[in-house]
UniProtKB/Swiss-Prot annotation:
Gene name as annotated: deoC
Enzyme superclass (EC): lyase
GO-annotated cellular components: cytoplasm
Organism of derivation: Kocuria rhizophila (strain ATCC 9341 / DSM 348 / NBRC 103217 / DC2201)
Key words, A-Z: Cytoplasm, Lyase, Schiff base
Family designation: Belongs to the DeoC/FbaB aldolase family. DeoC type 1 subfamily.
Subcellular location: Cytoplasm
Catalytic activity: 2-deoxy-D-ribose 5-phosphate = D-glyceraldehyde 3-phosphate + acetaldehyde
Database matches in SMART domains: DeoC (SM01133)
Name under which the protein is recorded: Deoxyribose-phosphate aldolase
Length: 218
């Protein structure tokens, strides 16, 4: 059985509401230190935050629609890294995915990867709830070829929904141990979080982190 500390170390403690205040972001960082999460994930305009020792700083790019031009995403990602972001969670161009233009999807990811090279960690949000199984596989393959470090299920803002165990399992099967898999969007209970890990998630995006962790033994 996974412990509370082990699960916390897999969590991006997340606050991406557009109306988030500086004080709320500061409280998020304090909570991350208290709970022992891997990182905090905040909007690009909220990266000026004091972090507890050991807590990484993650942000988003092209969020939440993914429909921005690649050049705009690249500038946004580079600016976030310049502000101290350790990790960037970018949204794919979902319209290109729906077109079946997987070269276009890959090139969009490559533009962001070029703007934030290693050691910056690049996660690619594919909006799995909006995709068929075949599209999920193709999106994961495009992310891998483009040099991403993780594939991620969801923004949490798409009307199609958030993470599902089935999508996480398929994503994990597609990328194997070559990329990480982040489950995010609608994970509100301990049971849901554990199910995502069991399905193959190696990182979790949670906004209700405390309540999820409290369901586990310390």
């Amino acid at each position: 059985m996974i412990t509370r500390a082990e699960l916390a170390a897999m969590v991006d403690h997340t606050l991406l509401k557009p109306e988030s205040t500086a004080e709320q972001v500061a409280e998020l960082a304090r909570e991350a230190g208290e709970l022992g999460t891997y990182s905090i994930c905040v909007s690009p305009s909220r990266l000026d935050v004091e972090l507890p020792e050991g807590v990484k700083l993650a942000t988003v790019c092209g969020f939440p629609s993914g429909a921005h031009p690649s050049e705009v995403k690249a500038v946004e990602a580079a600016d976030s890294v310049a502000q101290g972001a350790d990790e960037v969670d970018m949204v794919i161009n979902l319209g290109l995915a729906m077109d079946g233009d997987w070269d276009g999807v890959r090139e969009d990811i490559e533009a962001v990867r070029a703007a934030c090279p290693e050691p910056t960690v690049l996660k690619v949000i594919i909006e799995s709830a909006a995709l068929s199984d075949e599209q999920i596989v193709a999106a994961c393959q495009a992310a891998e070829v483009a040099g991403a470090d993780f594939v991620k299920t969801s923004t949490g803002f798409h009307p199609a929904g958030g993470a599902s165990v089935e999508a996480v399992r398929l994503m994990a099967q597609t990328v194997g141990d070559r990329l990480g898999v982040k489950a995010s969007g609608g994970i509100r209970t301990t049971e849901a979080a554990l199910a995502m890990v069991e399905a193959g998630a190696t990182r979790l995006g949670l906004s209700g982190t405390r309540s999820v962790l409290e369901g586990l033994d310390s």
